[in-house]
Amino acid sequence: ETSSTTLAFALYELALQTKLQERLRQEIEATIKKHNNEFTYECMEDMHYMKQVLAETQCKYPIAPNLMRQAAADYVVPGHPNYVIKKGMMVTIPTIGIHYDPATYPEPDKFDPERLSADALRLRDSVDWL
């Protein structure tokens, strides 16, 4: 089950890094208090660090290590005119390879929710997190 697996990995990482766990706990408590002690959709939407923690969990432990897509049109690989992906061909996108690329994610083995903050995301191409 994808949700329980993601949450299990998030809890594992938080157990290893108590400072991150404390920061998340403080955000949860403050946000719930701000929403009159009601845990609602709007309350969850205000938990920005929670979103970062879950996104980093999905980055480090992707449920689908690969994505499969079908080419909608012929595509010539830039710089390689003999490499053509024909319309209808299946293409494998290596999710884990993208998420563990040190050029995009320095220290990819490190659990670091800050790399998925709003400011950090603005500096990165949108296809660098799948």
List PLM regions with ranges:
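Conserved cytochrome P450 K-helix/beta-meander segment immediately N-terminal to the heme-binding cysteine loop
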Residues: 61, 93-123
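Long, K/E/R/D-enriched contiguous segments that form extended
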Residues: 9, 35-38
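A generic secondary-structure signal for well-formed alpha-helical elements
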Residues: 14-19, 28, 32-35, 61, ...
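Cytochrome P450 heme-thiolate "Cys pocket" and heme-binding signature region
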Residues: 81, 118-130
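Conserved cytochrome P450 K-helix E-x-x-R motif and the immediately C-terminal K′/meander segment
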Residues: 38-83, 102
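Cytochrome P450 catalytic-core helices
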Residues: 2-19, 23-27
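Amphipathic, well-packed alpha-helical segments that form the structural scaffold of globular domains
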Residues: 8, 25, 29, 55-62
